[in-house]
Amino acid sequence: MMKTLVVLAITLAVVSAGKVKFQDCGKGEVESLEVEGCSGDYCVIHKGKKLDLAISVTSNQDSANLKLDIVADINGVQIEVPGVDHDGCHYVKCPIKKGQHFDVKYTYSIPAILPTTKAKIIAKIIGDKGLGGCIVINGEIQD
C-alpha cells in the first residue's frame, strides 16, 4: 500500500532528498513523502532518469489485496502513468492489517515518452474495502 503511493511520488522529482508537500485526497493515511532531488510543494522530474522515493503510510483497513492507480492530470485530462505495476502486493507484503505502519523505499524510471508539461500526479491505493490512501503532488516533467 505504501509502496503504491511511493510510485505516485515517483512521477515528480530529481536531484537531492527532501520532504515533499502533498495534498491528501484520502483520510491522512500518508504521513510523509521524500523524493530524491525534490523538496517543498512543487517537484520537477526529468524524463529518462531514475527517481528514488521513500514514503510512510498507515493502513486504514484490513486487506488481502492492494491496487495502485497513478494518473497525471494535465489541464483536467487524466492520463494513466505508464510503467506502473498496479499490484500493490508486489511492494508491500499482503495481507495488510488496519493500523499497520509501512516505510517503503522505491525507485522508478521516468518514461521518456511522457510529455514535457506541468501536471498534478494523483496516486491512489485501493484495498478490499475501498480507498486506502491518496495523494496529489504538483510538478513538472522536463527533458
Swiss-Prot record:
An annotated GO cellular component: extracellular region
Signal peptide positions (record): 1-17
UniProt-annotated location(s): Secreted
Pfam families: E1_DerP2_DerF2
SMART domains associated with the record: ML
The organism's place on the tree of life at top rank: Eukaryota
GO MF terms held by the record: sterol binding
Spans through the membrane: none
InterPro entries, per the entry: Ig_E-set (IPR014756), ML_dom (IPR003172), NPC2-like (IPR039670)
Keywords annotated in UniProt: Allergen, Disulfide bond, Secreted, Signal
Disulfide bond annotation, renumbered to this chain: 25-134, 38-43, 89-94
GO biological process, one term: sterol transport
Family: Belongs to the NPC2 family.
Protein name according to UniProt: Mite group 2 allergen Pso o 2
Protein species of origin: Psoroptes ovis
